[in-house]
């Protein structure tokens, strides 16, 4: 599952060769809902698609369960950050569909002759900043 506020997950999938990321999610409204709240989840999918050169198909729940409202707004975005389908409704079941040519994602990662989203990464510079080895787990 791709959590919309954890960009590392989309990047890891892209580095491992993903061309499309399917995100079955539970985007929930904030305790103090904002009028533009739905736009944030859509924007995150657009940005992550563009940054990683992947399609993202995010399917969210609708309605309310145990007093918790869900945002709905399922969306499909293209590898250059283009919205392809959606956003779907917040309170009605809908099916959204988009044609996803996976070769478009492969081309999108290669932005120019000298710029490649995946192979230009310099993990030798920032690996230690990721902190994976230094996480203290209390359990």
Regions found by a protein language model. Give the residues of each.
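CN hydrolase (nitrilase-like) catalytic-core segments centered on the catalytic cysteine
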Residues: 2-94
